[in-house]
Amino acid sequence: MTHSVSPIGYIRSCFMEKFAIPRQPLLAPAARGTLELLPPFDQVEALEGLEQVSHVWLLFLFHQALEDKPRLKVRPPRLGGNRSLGVFATRATHRPNGIGQSVVRLEGFEAGRLWLSGIDLLDGTPVLDIKPYVPYADAVADARNGIADAPPPGIAVEWSEQARRQAHEHGQRLRQPVAELIEQCLAQDPRPAYQKPEPGRRYGVRLWDLDVHWHYPRPDLIRVLDVAGGD
Protein backbone atom coordinates (compact mmCIF):
# COMPACT_ATOMS: atom_id res chain seq x y z
CA MET A 1 0.00 0.00 0.00
CA THR A 2 1.35 3.43 -0.89
CA HIS A 3 0.21 6.91 0.03
CA SER A 4 1.12 10.24 -1.47
CA VAL A 5 1.58 13.41 0.58
CA SER A 6 1.83 17.03 -0.49
CA PRO A 7 3.57 19.91 1.31
CA ILE A 8 1.39 22.39 3.15
CA GLY A 9 4.14 25.00 2.84
CA TYR A 10 7.84 25.74 2.63
CA ILE A 11 10.42 27.04 5.08
CA ARG A 12 12.27 30.31 4.45
CA SER A 13 15.29 29.87 6.66
CA CYS A 14 18.50 31.54 7.77
CA PHE A 15 20.29 28.32 6.72
CA MET A 16 21.22 28.37 3.03
CA GLU A 17 23.21 25.12 3.18
CA LYS A 18 23.27 21.99 5.34
CA PHE A 19 26.68 22.61 6.90
CA ALA A 20 26.48 24.22 10.37
CA ILE A 21 22.76 23.60 10.86
CA PRO A 22 22.34 22.51 14.50
CA ARG A 23 21.80 18.77 14.73
CA GLN A 24 18.72 19.23 16.91
CA PRO A 25 16.09 21.98 17.13
CA LEU A 26 16.16 24.74 19.78
CA LEU A 27 19.96 24.51 20.21
CA ALA A 28 20.27 27.87 18.43
CA PRO A 29 17.41 30.11 19.60
CA ALA A 30 18.61 32.87 17.24
CA ALA A 31 17.99 30.62 14.20
CA ARG A 32 14.88 32.16 12.68
CA GLY A 33 12.69 31.52 9.69
CA THR A 34 9.17 31.60 8.38
CA LEU A 35 6.82 28.90 7.21
CA GLU A 36 4.95 30.10 4.14
CA LEU A 37 1.72 28.14 3.74
CA LEU A 38 0.16 27.01 0.48
CA PRO A 39 -3.56 27.15 -0.42
CA PRO A 40 -5.92 26.24 1.09
CA PHE A 41 -3.91 26.32 4.33
CA ASP A 42 -2.93 29.96 3.83
CA GLN A 43 -6.32 30.98 5.22
CA VAL A 44 -6.38 32.30 8.78
CA GLU A 45 -9.04 29.73 9.72
CA ALA A 46 -6.36 27.01 9.59
CA LEU A 47 -4.39 28.80 12.31
CA GLU A 48 -7.14 29.76 14.77
CA GLY A 49 -6.10 28.77 18.29
CA LEU A 50 -2.34 28.91 17.70
CA GLU A 51 -2.20 32.15 19.71
CA GLN A 52 -2.49 29.86 22.76
CA VAL A 53 0.57 27.81 21.76
CA SER A 54 4.26 28.60 22.37
CA HIS A 55 5.83 25.73 20.39
CA VAL A 56 4.83 23.56 17.45
CA TRP A 57 6.00 20.32 15.89
CA LEU A 58 6.88 20.49 12.21
CA LEU A 59 6.82 17.33 10.10
CA PHE A 60 8.92 17.87 6.99
CA LEU A 61 10.90 16.25 4.20
CA PHE A 62 14.69 15.98 4.14
CA HIS A 63 14.44 17.09 0.52
CA GLN A 64 18.19 17.06 -0.09
CA ALA A 65 18.67 13.57 1.34
CA LEU A 66 15.93 11.56 -0.39
CA GLU A 67 17.11 8.15 -1.60
CA ASP A 68 15.60 5.36 -3.69
CA LYS A 69 17.40 2.61 -1.79
CA PRO A 70 16.57 2.44 1.93
CA ARG A 71 19.36 2.30 4.48
CA LEU A 72 19.09 -0.10 7.40
CA LYS A 73 22.09 1.33 9.24
CA VAL A 74 23.49 4.85 9.37
CA ARG A 75 26.48 6.61 10.92
CA PRO A 76 25.14 9.34 13.22
CA PRO A 77 27.36 12.41 13.75
CA ARG A 78 26.84 12.08 17.51
CA LEU A 79 29.00 8.93 17.44
CA GLY A 80 31.75 10.55 15.41
CA GLY A 81 30.64 9.21 12.05
CA ASN A 82 32.64 6.02 12.56
CA ARG A 83 30.05 3.83 14.29
CA SER A 84 26.83 2.66 12.67
CA LEU A 85 23.43 2.09 14.27
CA GLY A 86 20.04 0.95 13.05
CA VAL A 87 18.30 3.78 11.25
CA PHE A 88 15.38 3.72 13.70
CA ALA A 89 17.72 4.30 16.66
CA THR A 90 18.89 7.61 15.19
CA ARG A 91 17.58 10.89 13.85
CA ALA A 92 19.82 10.73 10.80
CA THR A 93 18.57 12.55 7.72
CA HIS A 94 18.60 9.36 5.64
CA ARG A 95 15.13 8.03 6.49
CA PRO A 96 12.95 5.37 4.82
CA ASN A 97 10.48 8.05 3.70
CA GLY A 98 12.69 11.09 4.19
CA ILE A 99 10.48 12.44 6.99
CA GLY A 100 11.86 14.55 9.83
CA GLN A 101 10.28 16.32 12.77
CA SER A 102 11.37 19.29 14.83
CA VAL A 103 9.86 21.19 17.72
CA VAL A 104 10.32 24.96 17.29
CA ARG A 105 9.18 28.13 19.00
CA LEU A 106 6.21 29.88 17.45
CA GLU A 107 6.97 33.62 17.54
CA GLY A 108 3.81 34.73 15.76
CA PHE A 109 1.60 34.17 12.77
CA GLU A 110 -0.73 35.72 10.25
CA ALA A 111 -2.76 34.31 7.38
CA GLY A 112 -0.39 32.23 5.28
CA ARG A 113 2.71 32.65 7.42
CA LEU A 114 4.24 31.48 10.72
CA TRP A 115 7.31 33.10 12.29
CA LEU A 116 9.57 30.55 13.97
CA SER A 117 12.78 30.43 16.01
CA GLY A 118 15.10 27.68 17.19
CA ILE A 119 14.80 26.05 13.78
CA ASP A 120 17.15 23.43 12.33
CA LEU A 121 15.72 23.47 8.81
CA LEU A 122 17.28 24.24 5.46
CA ASP A 123 15.86 27.01 3.31
CA GLY A 124 13.22 25.57 0.99
CA THR A 125 12.34 22.60 3.22
CA PRO A 126 8.87 21.21 2.38
CA VAL A 127 6.64 21.00 5.46
CA LEU A 128 4.01 18.25 5.61
CA ASP A 129 2.15 19.11 8.81
CA ILE A 130 2.05 21.33 11.90
CA LYS A 131 1.05 20.05 15.32
CA PRO A 132 0.93 21.96 18.62
CA TYR A 133 3.42 20.97 21.29
CA VAL A 134 1.50 19.60 24.30
CA PRO A 135 3.74 19.85 27.40
CA TYR A 136 2.01 17.27 29.59
CA ALA A 137 2.06 14.66 26.83
CA ASP A 138 5.21 15.50 24.87
CA ALA A 139 7.64 15.99 27.78
CA VAL A 140 8.30 12.52 29.23
CA ALA A 141 9.79 12.91 32.70
CA ASP A 142 11.35 9.44 32.95
CA ALA A 143 12.50 9.14 29.33
CA ARG A 144 16.01 7.87 28.65
CA ASN A 145 18.32 7.64 25.67
CA GLY A 146 21.63 5.92 26.19
CA ILE A 147 22.91 7.11 22.82
CA ALA A 148 22.25 10.82 23.39
CA ASP A 149 21.54 11.35 27.07
CA ALA A 150 22.74 14.98 27.19
CA PRO A 151 23.60 17.79 24.80
CA PRO A 152 27.04 17.39 23.25
CA PRO A 153 29.71 19.60 24.81
CA GLY A 154 30.05 22.97 23.13
CA ILE A 155 33.18 24.62 21.81
CA ALA A 156 34.41 28.10 22.70
CA VAL A 157 33.90 30.81 20.07
CA GLU A 158 35.90 34.03 19.82
CA TRP A 159 35.78 36.84 17.26
CA SER A 160 38.17 39.01 15.32
CA GLU A 161 37.37 42.70 15.69
CA GLN A 162 36.47 42.86 12.01
CA ALA A 163 34.07 39.91 12.21
CA ARG A 164 32.34 41.29 15.30
CA ARG A 165 31.85 44.67 13.63
CA GLN A 166 30.59 43.08 10.41
CA ALA A 167 28.13 40.85 12.28
CA HIS A 168 26.73 43.86 14.13
CA GLU A 169 26.32 45.88 10.93
CA HIS A 170 24.66 43.04 9.04
CA GLY A 171 22.42 42.30 12.01
CA GLN A 172 21.12 45.86 11.89
CA ARG A 173 20.59 45.66 8.13
CA LEU A 174 18.77 42.31 8.26
CA ARG A 175 17.02 43.07 11.57
CA GLN A 176 18.19 39.67 12.74
CA PRO A 177 20.41 38.54 15.66
CA VAL A 178 23.30 37.70 13.32
CA ALA A 179 26.09 37.58 15.91
CA GLU A 180 24.02 35.38 18.22
CA LEU A 181 23.10 33.07 15.33
CA ILE A 182 26.74 32.63 14.30
CA GLU A 183 27.93 32.04 17.85
CA GLN A 184 25.15 29.58 18.72
CA CYS A 185 25.66 27.54 15.54
CA LEU A 186 29.45 27.45 15.71
CA ALA A 187 29.36 26.53 19.41
CA GLN A 188 27.84 23.22 18.25
CA ASP A 189 31.15 22.57 16.38
CA PRO A 190 29.80 21.87 12.88
CA ARG A 191 32.84 20.03 11.53
CA PRO A 192 32.66 16.23 11.26
CA ALA A 193 33.63 14.70 14.61
CA TYR A 194 36.25 12.46 12.98
CA GLN A 195 38.01 15.45 11.38
CA LYS A 196 40.90 17.02 13.27
CA PRO A 197 40.99 20.72 12.36
CA GLU A 198 44.20 22.29 11.10
CA PRO A 199 44.85 25.88 12.30
CA GLY A 200 45.47 27.10 8.75
CA ARG A 201 42.25 25.73 7.29
CA ARG A 202 39.35 28.13 6.79
CA TYR A 203 35.79 26.92 7.12
CA GLY A 204 32.76 28.72 5.77
CA VAL A 205 28.98 28.68 5.70
CA ARG A 206 26.22 30.85 4.27
CA LEU A 207 23.67 32.25 6.74
CA TRP A 208 20.97 34.55 5.37
CA ASP A 209 22.87 36.39 2.60
CA LEU A 210 26.16 36.29 4.52
CA ASP A 211 29.32 34.27 4.06
CA VAL A 212 30.79 33.45 7.47
CA HIS A 213 34.40 32.22 7.75
CA TRP A 214 36.26 30.81 10.73
CA HIS A 215 39.17 28.60 11.70
CA TYR A 216 40.36 26.54 14.66
CA PRO A 217 43.41 28.11 16.36
CA ARG A 218 43.18 25.08 18.67
CA PRO A 219 41.00 21.97 18.44
CA ASP A 220 38.85 23.33 21.29
CA LEU A 221 38.46 26.89 19.96
CA ILE A 222 36.77 28.55 16.97
CA ARG A 223 37.74 32.04 15.86
CA VAL A 224 35.33 33.90 13.57
CA LEU A 225 37.41 35.65 10.90
CA ASP A 226 34.92 37.60 8.79
CA VAL A 227 31.24 38.00 7.99
CA ALA A 228 30.86 39.17 4.40
CA GLY A 229 27.93 39.66 2.05
CA GLY A 230 24.79 41.65 1.65
CA ASP A 231 26.02 43.35 -1.52
UniProtKB/Swiss-Prot annotation:
EC numbers on record: 2.1.1.-
Pfam families recorded: TrmO_C, TrmO_N
Keyword NAD among record annotations: no
Keyword Transferase applies: yes
Enzyme class, first EC level, given as a word: transferase
Positions bound to S-adenosyl-L-methionine: 22-24, 63-64, 91, 122-125
UniProt keyword list: Methyltransferase, S-adenosyl-L-methionine, Transferase
Example of a GO biological process term: methylation
Gene Ontology molecular function: any one: tRNA (L-threonylcarbamoyladenosine(37)-C2) methyltransferase activity
Location of the TsaA-like domain: 5-142
NCBIfam families: tRNA_TsaA (TIGR00104)
Family as reported in the entry's similarity comment: Belongs to the tRNA methyltransferase O family.
Protein name: Putative S-adenosylmethionine-dependent methyltransferase RcsF
Organism of this sequence: Pseudomonas aeruginosa (strain ATCC 15692 / DSM 22644 / CIP 104116 / JCM 14847 / LMG 12228 / 1C / PRS 101 / PAO1)
